[in-house]
Amino acid sequence: MKVNPSVKKICDKCKVIRRNGRVMVICENPRHKQRQG
């Protein structure tokens, strides 16, 4: 899980979602997991 001020899709499988008011990226590749904060 990377915590970045700006989250971007890294590959085609990445999805940007909102969870509990936080913007997150979920992906098949666990290295691509990101959270804004």
Curated annotation (Swiss-Prot):
InterPro entries registered for this protein in UniProt: Ribosomal_bL36, Ribosomal_bL36_sp
Name of this chain's protein: Large ribosomal subunit protein bL36A
Any single GO CC term annotated in Swiss-Prot or TrEMBL for this entry: ribonucleoprotein complex
Gene name in the database record: rpmJ1
Keywords noted in UniProt: Ribonucleoprotein, Ribosomal protein
Residue ranges of the TM segments: none
Protein species of origin: Leifsonia xyli subsp. xyli (strain CTCB07)
Family: Belongs to the bacterial ribosomal protein bL36 family.
Gene Ontology biological process terms in this record: translation
PROSITE patterns recorded: RIBOSOMAL_L36
